[in-house]
């Protein structure tokens, strides 16, 4: 079997082979070199078209030959020096100067038209081109470029629901002329979202199908005759689907073996696994030594990976980015101060979430700030589920998406998240105050151990869906954004909120009296679907001093008065 570098060299030469190579000419020569048997030669020679002969020739050569030298010698013998020179040049640069392989050898033979074709065949979704987060897109391109020579890797693109992870990944693949076709021979994009072992099995069954389909399409590729190319792709791809073996009763071991065999023909493929939820998906990809770009809400699944891992966090939109996004979709520029206030209110309520902003824009008919103010009011009184519409985002409301995040949390993390609704949004709150209300189970009366346990619980929530955000300066603090608080306020049981307020009052009073709070608490929490209530005003964004911890509820009196009014309705 050829080594990976030589497999890549054959893939890179594929277009040139289609233009000027007849496998029948090489069979007798390679039989003499003990590469092929008579059976191989008969099978390849009897193929009805040259494209099929090339496809089967390359497939057999990858498996039967131990090096490219015999084929290169044939090209020299057959006076096809352009093929010999290309393969020699590729192997020399790949071995001695890999950093110059792409600009010197590959780039001159690649075109934008081929990139678009590879993106289409790789199932890469077409995304918006009216707005782009250039910083994040360029970081993805840079990381994929840096890691392309690794045998296997994971690049995790992680962030909150609706933050635009899939859009950024798609835009990165579409923007760069270097990634697909130069750094990577091809791409396969698959949507995951599965939460069961069967879902993981189905995902990799689809991956096998995409690899087989990609091989058929590549084997019939002829960029000089586009109509014939399309017809061949359609007919061969349909045949490939019809002849695809059933994997209904195949074990996971057999499926992995089938994928590994298919990867011989696609040795340098980038796999984009979108919306990964389970660590089993990471384990499968690791066993198969895939090169993966992963989009996920839960960055903790990266713990299942041992190869090279890199991380890019997709943060909420900055205020200026929110303006640009809405303007790109046709929202008018604020003309007066009142319009600016309404727009800022929308940005605050959505916490710069692109999906939420898009839903507000799509629901804003007519496109006036008066209508936007009405939508803001609906959000405040009825929660995120009040605005529901069809957008490019896969959920009709952000509430449904966040609810899915909650469902995959452990019972302990879900209970901690429920009591996060007691905290005012947009405020960096020290762990000591969080410890007053977050339920944990410890066997010690040590106050520091309680704080450490609570900090660990809050850290998990910040990693599993960016439901909270942490900061270490000047002390360790955690913050709940407005959009998450707005979601929790209308799904957490009212009695749980009322109990949480009461517990917080009691613990803060004990802090003021220098009493040690009880470290073990098991407070029941329940989520509900709908309710109504008043939203809170914007509060100060400064870290409270330790001597003022007991005054926390007094400092944020307006918020707690509003929350108490909400629970009494």
From Swiss-Prot:
SUPFAM superfamilies: DEATH domain, P-loop containing nucleoside triphosphate hydrolases, Winged helix' DNA-binding domain. GO terms for biological process: actin filament depolymerization; apoptotic process; apoptotic process involved in development; defense response to Gram-negative bacterium; embryo development ending in birth or egg hatching; embryonic morphogenesis; muscle cell cellular homeostasis; negative regulation of apoptotic process. ATP binds at residues 131, 162-167, 171. SMART domains: CARD. One of its GO terms (molecular function) is identical protein binding. Residues 116-442 form the NB-ARC domain. It holds the Pfam family NB-ARC. Keywords: Apoptosis, ATP-binding, Cytoplasm, Magnesium, Metal-binding, Mitochondrion, Nucleotide-binding. It comes from the Eukaryota. Mg(2+) binds at residue 166. GO terms for cellular component: caspase complex; cytosol; membrane; mitochondrion; nucleus; perinuclear region of cytoplasm. Residues 1-91 form the CARD domain. It is found in: Mitochondrion; Cytoplasm, Perinuclear region. Plays a major role in programmed cell death (PCD, apoptosis). egl-1 binds to and directly inhibits the activity of ced-9, releasing the cell death activator ced-4 from a ced-9/ced-4 containing protein complex and allowing ced-4 to induce caspase ced-3 autoproteolytic cleavage and activation. Also forms a holoenzyme with processed ced-3 enhancing ced-3 activity. Component of the egl-1, ced-9, ced-4 and ced-3 apoptotic signaling cascade required for the initiation of programmed cell death in cells fated to die during embryonic and postembryonic development. Associates as an asymmetric homodimer with ced-9. Upon release from ced-9, forms an octamer, known as the apoptosome, and interacts with ced-3; the interaction results in ced-3 autoproteolytic cleavage and activation. The octamer (a tetramer of an asymmetric dimer) also interacts with two processed ced-3 to form a stable holoenzyme. Interacts with sex-determining protein fem-1. May form a complex composed of ced-3, ced-4 and mac-1 or of ced-9, ced-4 and mac-1. Within the complex, interacts with ced-4. This is Cell death protein 4. It comes from Caenorhabditis briggsae. The lineage of its organism: Eukaryota, Metazoa, Ecdysozoa, Nematoda, Chromadorea.
């Amino acid at each position: 079997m050829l080594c990976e570098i030589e497999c890549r060299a054959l893939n890179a030469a594929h277009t040139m082979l289609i233009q000027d190579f007849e496998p029948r000419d090489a069979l007798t020569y390679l039989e003499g070199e003990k590469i092929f048997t008579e059976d191989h030669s008969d099978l390849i020679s009897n193929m009805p078209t040259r494209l099929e002969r090339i496809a089967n020739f390359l497939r057999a050569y990858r498996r039967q030959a131990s090096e490219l030298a015999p084929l290169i010698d044939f090209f020299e013998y057959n006076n096809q020096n352009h093929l010999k020179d290309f393969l020699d040049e590729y192997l020399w640069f790949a071995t001695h100067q890999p950093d110059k392989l792409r600009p010197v050898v590959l780039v001159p033979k690649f075109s934008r038209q081929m990139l678009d074709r590879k993106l289409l065949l790789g199932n890469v979704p077409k995304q918006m081109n009216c707005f782009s987060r250039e910083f994040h897109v360029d970081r993805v391109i840079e990381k994929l470029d840096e890691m392309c020579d690794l045998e296997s890797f994971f690049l995790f693109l992680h962030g909150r629901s609706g933050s635009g992870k899939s859009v950024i990944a798609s835009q990165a693949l579409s923007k760069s002329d270097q990634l697909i076709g130069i750094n990577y021979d091809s791409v396969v994009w698959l949507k995951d979202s599965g939460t069961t072992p069967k879902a993981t099995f189905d995902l990799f069954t689809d991956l096998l199908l995409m690899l087989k389909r990609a091989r058929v399409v590549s084997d019939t590729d002829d960029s000089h005759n586009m109509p014939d190319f399309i017809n061949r792709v359609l007919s061969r791809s349909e045949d490939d689907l019809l002849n695809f073996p059933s994997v209904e009763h195949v074990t996971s071991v057999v499926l992995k073996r089938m994928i590994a065999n298919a990867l011989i023909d696609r040795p340098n493929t980038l796999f984009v696994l979108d919306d990964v939820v389970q660590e089993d998906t990471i384990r499968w990809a690791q066993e198969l030594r895939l090169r993966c770009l992963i989009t996920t809400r839960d960055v903790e699944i990266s713990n299942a990976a041992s190869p090279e891992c890199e991380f890019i966090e997709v943060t909420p939109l900055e205020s200026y980015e929110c303006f640009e996004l809405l303007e790109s979709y046709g929202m008018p520029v604020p003309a007066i101060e009142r319009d600016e206030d309404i727009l800022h209110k929308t940005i605050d309520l959505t916490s710069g979430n692109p999906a939420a902003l898009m839903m507000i824009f799509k629901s804003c008919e007519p496109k006036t700030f008066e209508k936007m103010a009405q939508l803001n009011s609906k959000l405040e009184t009825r929660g995120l589920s009040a605005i529901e519409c069809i957008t490019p985002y896969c959920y009709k409301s952000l509430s449904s998406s966040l609810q899915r995040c909650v469902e995959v949390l452990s019972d302990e993390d879900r209970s901690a998240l429920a009591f996060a609704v007691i905290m005012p949004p947009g405020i960096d709150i020290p762990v000591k105050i969080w410890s007053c209300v977050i339920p944990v189970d410890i066997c010690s009366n040590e106050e520091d151990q309680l704080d450490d346990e609570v900090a660990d619980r809050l850290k998990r929530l910040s990693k599993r869906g960016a439901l909270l955000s942490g900061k270490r300066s000047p002390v360790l603090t955690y913050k709940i954004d407005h959009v998450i608080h707005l979601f929790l306020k209308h799904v957490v049981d009212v009695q749980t909120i009322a109990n949480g307020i009461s517990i917080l009052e009691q613990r803060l009073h004990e802090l003021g009296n220098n009493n040690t709070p009880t470290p073990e608490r098991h407070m029941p929490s329940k989520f509900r679907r709908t309710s109504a209530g008043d939203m809170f005003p914007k509060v100060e964004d400064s870290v409270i001093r330790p001597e003022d911890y007991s005054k926390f509820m007094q400092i944020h009196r307006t918020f707690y008065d509003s929350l108490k009014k909400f629970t009494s309705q």
